């Protein structure tokens, strides 16, 4: 149980942030909010940014989305670029949840690679997905293509899978195959399995059965059990002919 060892007005901003975090971890949300609200930007802009991000997260857990978006919106890039990036990502997710599609795009678009590579990658992935749902395929492709493996391997893998799917709908099979082929198991085993499954069918359509067999054979049970079973069925059917 967390108990402050001195009055709040005698604690530094960092100590109050730590106390707020401890309350949050213990599920004492009201106590966490009360402590975090005492931190001002004039005391320490960096810690203020961290406190507002945490406040937003707490309000989000409580379902108080208006309060959450208000807190995240107070995080300024110049105070703490990485915290700003994640606050903007959370804003985008919340705006999407409540149906503010233009505002989610704006929030995610505020995130730059230099703020946080990982936040940038997941924001670009989310942007791509949103543009896709709006039938803006060119914009979706542009967003997914912005993600590098060294930003975030998992986001890169799923972006490449989505790119391949987009190219397939545009009848650009070579581009689709290139995108799916770029995914490695160590990026994300599940995305890798889906990519190999798609590659198998793409090669089968092109009557490149050796390549199809290789792709399906690459899928392991631990990657994705259902895709593994499907790949084994496909291999059995191909080997019959």
PLM regions: where:
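TPR-adjacent "capping" and linker segments in tetratricopeptide-repeat scaffold/adaptor proteins
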Residues: 1-15, 43-46, 79
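Start-of-helix register in tetratricopeptide repeats
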Residues: 14, 46-50, 86, 122, ...
């Amino acid at each position: 149980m967390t108990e402050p060892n001195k009055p709040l007005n005698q604690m530094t901003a960092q100590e109050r942030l730590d106390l707020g975090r401890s309350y949050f971890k213990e599920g004492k949300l009201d106590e966490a909010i009360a402590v975090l609200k005492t931190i001002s930007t004039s005391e320490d802009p960096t810690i203020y940014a961290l406190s507002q991000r945490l406040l937003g997260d707490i309000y989000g857990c409580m379902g108080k989305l208006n309060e959450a978006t208000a807190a995240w919106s107070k995080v300024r890039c110049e105070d703490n670029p990485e915290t700003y990036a994640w606050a903007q990502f959370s804003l985008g997710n919340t705006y999407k949840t409540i149906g503010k599609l233009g505002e989610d795009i704006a929030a995610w678009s505020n995130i730059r690679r230099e703020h946080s590579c990982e936040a940038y990658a997941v924001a670009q992935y989310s942007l791509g997905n949103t543009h896709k749902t709006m039938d803006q395929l060119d914009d979706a492709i542009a967003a997914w293509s912005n993600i590098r493996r060294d930003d975030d391997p998992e986001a890169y893998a799923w972006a490449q899978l989505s790119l391949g799917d987009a190219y397939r709908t545009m009848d650009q099979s070579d581009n689709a195959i290139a995108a799916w082929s770029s995914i490695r198991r160590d990026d994300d085993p599940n995305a890798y399995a889906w990519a190999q499954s798609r590659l198998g069918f793409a090669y089968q359509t092109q009557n490149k059965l050796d390549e199809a067999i290789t792709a399906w054979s690459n899928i392991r049970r631990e990657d994705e059990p259902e895709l593994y079973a499907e790949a084994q069925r496909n291999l059995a059917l191909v080997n019959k002919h």
